Amino acid sequence: MSLVDNQRPLQPEYVPGSITDRESERKALKQALNSIHLPNILLHGPRGTGKTLLTRQLITQLEDDIQHHYIDCIHHDTEHKALRKLHTSITGEDTPQGFHTSKLQRKIEKQLKHVRHLIVLDEADFLLQNNGNSLLYYLSRINKPANLGIIIVSAHTASLQSQIDERTYSTLQPRRIGTEPYTSEQVYQILSERARQSLEPTSLHHEALTYLASATENTKLGLHWLRHTAQNTSQPISEETLKQTQKQAHHRFTERTLSHHTDHHRTLYKAIQDFDDYPVNSGQIYTTYREHCRKRDLKPLSNRRISDYIQHLKLHGLIETKTYYGGKHGKTTQIQPSSLLQ
């Protein structure tokens, strides 16, 4: 029971031949990367606006004398994890976990001297949240011979100046390239093209595609929703079909997003979903989280650590938060599930 002929164009890692309405950003990136000296770039914009696609497409078109290294900072969210990934990418060898950070740094520096290298730090917000700017500081210090360029991809940071210390920023001096949210018309165009490549002919009604495009600006979520629906029906997809699958598709999207994180991330998210009225104060979330931990035989984390995990959920776009200062209780954070997933 499926309307899918070709899975690939609906997968999140698929890189199309052309990227909808991102020509100016593509040209800006390509022009920067064609410089004699590799630049440092901050590519920023909301989730699902083509940042990763742009980067993945362009690194395949680099000159032959430039080696590129792609690091997903969701999976490599500390300096040591990112350095291990970088060392493996440079050398083609497995990197033992026992390597000390300083030893990894020395081995990497030796390799970087020989040819030009471009390092992509995708989802860099997770690295900055967990580990501050230690990796960027290290990379900025070995960037002197201009053999190294860095692309920092961020969904939440429009300017690194507020995220990293002054000496690191002054050395990096990244060029800023931003992507704006897609309009519903642009989302429609993207989903329509992917559906044409993936689904059986006449299996998606026009009004269904219009509804899907208007319901989300995040193309990743839209593609997941379309894929989930097409895989679980044998009838042409109507607007009503999408409404029926919306809750389950969003649930699966969240599960997939959190699959690379800990049980505590999933437990925390479940605790946030337990309430009927939002927003909810962080103190109420902590209490409900501990109750879930007892039921699951998990040792609860400290409030400080849970505060970090709340930021992880926010970085993924799964929740929205607002912090208030002052008043009887001092600093208060209010939390609610993302409006995109309602």
Language-model region placement:
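Walker A/P-loop nucleotide-binding motif
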Residues: H37-Q57
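Mid-core helix/loop region of P-loop NTP-binding domains shared across ATPases and GTPases
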Residues: Q11, T55, H75-V187, P201-L226, ...
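Terminal-proximal interaction/regulatory segments of ATP-powered molecular machines
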Residues: V280-Q342
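A short, basic N-terminal segment
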Residues: M1-P39, T60-Q61
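Conserved C-terminal helix/linker of AAA+ ATPases
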Residues: N232-F253
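Short amphipathic alpha-helical interface segments
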Residues: D263-E291
